[in-house]
């Protein structure tokens, strides 16, 4: 899910359904899903991976503007969005590049364009990750996270791990 392929016809990328043979390049998976959710009375949410292994500027300051422009497309073209899901992917691995995303500006963009949406990540700011890939919460697990300890998605360290497992 970090390959950068856009399931909507993004104007910011050529790595998108618009350049694929699916529906002769006229398809939009995100549109179909958002419409289906509304028809079924379900609330709609989106995920946009911050780590795009396909983009040439990943790891450079220019990438941040690109990422936010894609997020802006998702937040403005599909009606009300209930949840925006983020993870802290920072180019892990021996060939990865670490990217600083400026999360406060990303969170601000969501608040401005979709004020009713909740944001999920390991750092919140609204709903936080349980702290592991198994979905098993530690015991006890309080619902709060100290923003100073987990200031952004992808923050690392023993205190971060403990807080995600048990709360503050």
Language-model regions, residue ranges each:
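Mature catalytic domains of secreted/periplasmic carbohydrate-active enzymes
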Residues: 1-168
